[in-house]
Amino acid sequence: MRRAIKKITQAVSPPQAAPVAASAGAAASAPTSTTSVAACSAVAAVSGTASAPASGGASERATNATVDEVATKVKKDVNKTIDDVKMTPFLRKITFFSSGGSFLDGYVLAIIGVALTQITPLFALDTMWSAAVGASVFLGIFFGTILGGWLTDLVGRRAMFIIDVVAIGVFSVLSVFAADPLQLVLARFAIGLFVGADYPIATSLIAEFTPKAHRSISMGAVSAAWYLGATAAAFVGFALVGIEDGWKWMLGSAVVPCIILLIGRHDIPESPLWLQSKGKFAEARAVMDRVFGEDIEIHEDEQPTKTSLGFLFKAGYFKRIIYLGILTLCQVVPMYAIYTFGPDIMSAFGLSEGRMSILGESAVSLFFLIGTIPAMFWLNSLGRRPLLIGSLFFMAVGLVILGIFPDAPIWVVIIAFGLYAFFSGGPGILQWLYPNELFPTHVRASAVGISISISRIGTIISTYGTPIFLENFGVGPTMLVAAGLVILGLVLSVMMAPETRGQSLQESSMLN
């Protein structure tokens, strides 16, 4: 197809056009120029229609007009890029299995909250050790996102895409054999390290393979997968909490999704945008031909560029990094605290301890999951910025109600939690979508990693401090602190949130 297009372009180019006969009689009797015939033949070959040679000045002008129209169409086709294609089953597969790392994150985080109901009395954990077990995974995520993002930009998306899932499965099995709190903390830290590495890997792959019209939906799948993993963990925990040594089955069960992910990820190729950014043009072209077809071109301005973290500290990009880090912190700190210590928080609101408190957490998990579904589409219809600001407002309202009325009836508690959880859908997607849209290919994974790592500083502190704060101040003040964080994110977003709807990755990553 590209060779046929080249022939058409050469045929209609002015320098090669044959001169028109000087006299009217010659023009009337002479056949159409060889060039025009060649152009029409090439056009016919591509379009599947036949064109007969024309004669005469009027026919010549008509032919030239037709060729000009075809040339314009051909030029448009030549410039067709990833953003112009439709979603295919293979692109959906990339989204599905790339989202699996997010599923694992939600699963391993939420399952520990349920497992702690058995681990705490078994290992005689005090508040400090319980907090350490909960926070250790976030410390691992903090280092994993930074290191994983840098390595992903340096050595590629695909290599890290496989390694991290294997490691998560191995350390999940090892955590089953923990004989004391320290071993459990170390195993959880290692799991967090590789879960954190998967954030920049998977979301970069999705962003670089997905057309812009579908990007918010594909990133929405990442966010939905997190909530789906957390919801699945809550129900698995609910089923196993009454079994002797159920905590071992809970922690070891993470190996099942790891195996499924390995099977699904084995044939997903390297990102063509990353390959081109490293000067590997032939490999990039081969991936494009395999995934999109020979007629689709890579973005023209993706030029070979050396990966450098210093690039992110340029004035404009540094501002974006700080904003995204704080925004994500304000969004995820309350959510992670709720998931990690969900049963304790539910008990504090009056849901009886044990299985009923776990069931209450499961209901809240469903609200989180349901909220991502309309948000996927609202991000395109309403835009990124309006949805973010509106969602943060309603999230704050839900937490303020919980903080002011901690002794409210259970139905009020569930509705307030539901309000907070449902509207977390938009910001939950944007924590993945914004970093991938606002930074260029050669530092995209690094930017995702750094912005996520900034937020994880807050999650480490909050996860360690939540049980201590709950014990000393109660659930009402705890919820008000969470509301304050969401309000901070709201104020910053009013001041700084960009609008990237409908833009290509090249357009959205440019500094204004």
Set out the residue ranges of the language-model regions:
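Transmembrane-helix signature of 12-pass secondary carriers
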Residues: 1-22, 26-30, 34-36, 40, ...
